[in-house]
Amino acid sequence: MKKYFKKSWYKGKYRNISIEKYPGLYRPGSSPYFSGDTLRKYADFIFDETQSFKPRNVKKNNIVFVKTDLLEIYFSYYHKKIDSEYILVSHNSDSAVTKAETKFLDDKIIHWFAMKLDFPSNEKISPIPSGLENKRFLTNGKIKNFKEVEKKVRTDFEKYDKKILCSFNVHTNFNERKPLIEKVKNNNLYDIRKFTSNYEYLSELSKYKFILCPEGNNFESHRIWESLIFNCTPIVRSNTVNTNFFNLGVPLLIIDDWSYLNGLTFDDLVNLNQININKEYRKFSTWKYWKELIDSKTL
C-alpha cells in the first residue's frame, strides 16, 4: 500500500491530506477495536474511492458509508434517488464535517454519524471517532500488537508506574505539535520518547497514566483511541471535535491551551482527571460500543 500526502488549506492552517494508491485491494476490519474500515465493512452500502451503489436498492434502516471527501457528490447524485429512511456514516478522511453540511440533512436520514464533527452534535448528527489506524496500512493498526499488550497488562503489576508520555510525529501537524514539544521539553514530568516499533510504543503506553494527544490531520488523533484501550488518559487541547466526544462520555482531559501544562503539577492533573474516574475507558475504542450506538438509531 502506497500512501502520499498533499497540503490542504483549512481554517487558516495547512494540513496534510492523505492520498492513497490502490485503496480497494485490502480493506479488513479491526474488530474487536474500532476503525474506519471496521465501520465501512459493517455498512450495507459504500460510496468511496473504490465503489458506489444503486440508490434505489437502499432499504429502511440500512447503513450507508460515505467517504467524507465525497459528500458533495453523494448528496448531489445519490441521496436524492434514495426512497427509504437510512443511517448515514461519513469517515475515512482528513476532512471535517462542518455546519455547512447540515444543508444536506432531511427526513430520509435517520441519523448521521460523522467523523471529525466540527460543530456541536444534536439529535440528528453525532460524532464517531477515527479509532485505530486502518489495518490495511500494516503499520500502527496491527491488531495482534494491541491484543498482545492487553494480555501482558492483565498480568503486569507494575502498570501505571509512569506519568506522562509525549510521543508523536511532529511533522503530521507541525504548527500544532512543534510548539507543544518546545513547551514541555524542559519539564521532567513529560517523557519525550521515540520508539522503534509499534509494539514497543504500545507496551510503554500501557504503563503511563497520561499521554499528550495533539491534533494530527485535522482535529483528531488515533493516539486518543490507542491510549483508551490501556486506560491511559489522553490530554487534549480544546476544540469542538474533542468536546463532542467528551460530552458523549469519552474520558478526555481537555485543556484550553498547551501553555497551561507547565503551570500544572502531576497531582494537579490527577485531581483534574477525577472527572473521568468512574468511566470505562476501553469501551470507547471497541467496535462493540459504536456498533450498538449505530444500531440504536434504527426505526
Residue ranges and their predicted role:
Residues L228:
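Short alpha-helix at the nucleotide-sugar/activated-sugar donor binding site of glycosyltransferases
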Residues K2-H222, T233-V250, N271-T298:
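Nucleotide-sugar donor-binding catalytic core of glycosyltransferases
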